[in-house]
Amino acid sequence: MIPVRCFTCGKVISTAYEEFKRRRDASEDPKRILDDLGMDRYCCRRMLLTHKEIIDELNPYQ
């Protein structure tokens, strides 16, 4: 489950997650990706950098 807003400042970050994930999987530098996406605040950067997808692990327990 992708976080919709930054927990600290409330900025919408879900719009940047898919592109961040795609570019990170292509081995691009996370700093450059976040700079290009306009994620200037360190709290928002933290939200994207530390997010871990666990939805596939939770599906069997529905």
From Swiss-Prot:
Q: Which GO terms describe its molecular function?
A: DNA binding; DNA-directed RNA polymerase activity; zinc ion binding
One Pfam family from the UniProt entry?
Answer: RNA_pol_N
Catalysed reaction(s)? RNA(n) + a ribonucleoside 5'-triphosphate = RNA(n+1) + diphosphate
Where is it predominantly found? cytoplasm
In terms of InterPro entries, this protein maps to:
RNA_pol_su_RPB10, RNA_pol_suN_Zn-BS, RPABC5/Rpb10
By its UniProt entry, which PROSITE patterns does this protein fall under? RNA_POL_N_8KD
Q: What is its EC number?
A: 2.7.7.6
Query: Where does this protein hold Zn(2+)?
Result: 6, 9, 43-44
Q: Which family does it belong to?
A: Belongs to the archaeal Rpo10/eukaryotic RPB10 RNA polymerase subunit family.
Subunit text = Part of the RNA polymerase complex.
What does the protein in this record do? DNA-dependent RNA polymerase (RNAP) catalyzes the transcription of DNA into RNA using the four ribonucleoside triphosphates as substrates.
Give the protein's recorded name: DNA-directed RNA polymerase subunit Rpo10
Report the source organism: Methanospirillum hungatei JF-1 (strain ATCC 27890 / DSM 864 / NBRC 100397 / JF-1)
Q: State the organism's lineage.
A: Archaea, Methanobacteriati, Methanobacteriota, Stenosarchaea group, Methanomicrobia
